[in-house]
Curated annotation (Swiss-Prot):
<keyword id="KW-0597">Phosphoprotein</keyword>
<feature type="domain" description="BAR">
    <location>
        <begin position="27"/>
        <end position="261"/>
    </location>
</feature>
<dbReference type="InterPro" id="IPR001452">
    <property type="entry name" value="SH3_domain"/>
</dbReference>
<keyword id="KW-0496">Mitochondrion</keyword>
<keyword id="KW-0472">Membrane</keyword>
<protein>
    <recommendedName>
        <fullName>Endophilin-B1</fullName>
    </recommendedName>
</protein>
<dbReference type="InterPro" id="IPR027267">
    <property type="entry name" value="AH/BAR_dom_sf"/>
</dbReference>
<dbReference type="GO" id="GO:0030496">
    <property type="term" value="C:midbody"/>
</dbReference>
<dbReference type="GO" id="GO:0000139">
    <property type="term" value="C:Golgi membrane"/>
</dbReference>
<comment type="subunit">
    <text>Homodimer, and heterodimer with SH3GLB2. Binds BAX; induction of apoptosis augments BAX binding. Binds DNM1, HTT, AMPH, BIN1 and ARFGAP1. Interacts with UVRAG; UVRAG bridges the interaction to BECN1 indicative for an association with the PI3K complex II (PI3KC3-C2).</text>
</comment>
<dbReference type="GO" id="GO:0006915">
    <property type="term" value="P:apoptotic process"/>
</dbReference>
<keyword id="KW-0446">Lipid-binding</keyword>
<dbReference type="InterPro" id="IPR036028">
    <property type="entry name" value="SH3-like_dom_sf"/>
</dbReference>
<feature type="region of interest" description="Membrane-binding amphipathic helix">
    <location>
        <begin position="1"/>
        <end position="30"/>
    </location>
</feature>
<dbReference type="InterPro" id="IPR028503">
    <property type="entry name" value="SH3GLB_SH3"/>
</dbReference>
<feature type="region of interest" description="Required for membrane binding">
    <location>
        <begin position="1"/>
        <end position="37"/>
    </location>
</feature>
<dbReference type="InterPro" id="IPR035695">
    <property type="entry name" value="SH3GLB1_BAR"/>
</dbReference>
Amino acid sequence: MNIMDFNVKKLAADAGTFLSRAVQFTEEKLGQAEKTELDAHLENLLSKAECTKIWTEKIMKQTEVLLQPNPNARIEEFVYEKLDRKAPSRINNPELLGQYMIDAGTEFGPGTAYGNALIKCGETQKRIGTADRELIQTSALNFLTPLRNFIEGDYKTIAKERKLLQNKRLDLDAAKTRLKKAKAAETRASSEQELRITQSEFDRQAEITRLLLEGISSTHAHHLRCLNDFVEAQMTYYAQCYQYMLDLQKQLGSFPSNYHSNNNQTAVAPVPSASSNVIGSSALTSTSSLVITSPSNLTDLKECGGSRRARVLYDYDAANSTELSLLADEVITVFSVVGMDSDWLMGERGNQKGRVPITYLELLN
């Protein structure tokens, strides 16, 4: 019974306090009551905290978009995070593109120029995908998590104490208003006592709020370190991607010029019409030696009709008796043969001789 009486009294007191604050707030808005202003330093701290919160949220959300452009994937990760479960690993776009390229290159044949180039590009894309995954993980841990901790932790505490300060300020101003309206000596003494209590509570809450807000400078310093970590992660990522692409470019650039087309006969200048089959056949034969027009080592080799030394890039198993099996890093002699497919050269090792795919070779000076 006593507990029930206590709860009723507390409920009535809380309702009275809430009503008093509502009246004071309304009268302030209508200009019918005075409002205690916070000191300039505290106001500046509150403004700084609010500004920090707004921009931190914007930076955090846009960084998430940068690292994961797919909104559905971001929603999925958010749900798993709220469920305190690890999101399933998913293949990213560079990895998917790389796998498609590798599959296509395998389908076209690694012994063809285009197929071999696709495989190399695919492997590079998959390495870029791995670097992208590492960037996301590092950035989430060292940059996004500290920003989110501030929004969901420190700033929520600041907002809670700020709201409490606002309530204490309303209580103080309501007490001041009641003191002004008090006429009887007994009522005035009670109002003065209430004013002293509310003033003390307001000052105490203002000090608590000020101490919390002064921690924003430390937050900025911490976020600066996190920003440096993010920049370093990006620098590492872009440096890796640049190196991967540079290596790929060198590999593709080391290919003979006819790597750029598996069917470079389509680039041959059209054969003029002839008055006889003999002339047409002669014209076709003469143009067969002009299919490679860019000045490259392979062009020189074919034009001079001589032989060159070549280093084998990869192991190659001969498909039939007309081909020559190769071992990576061995050096063989190669030369062109009139009428041979543009993707092949004739290779010679000792007394062994056979066709070899040019995609497996690097011509030596």
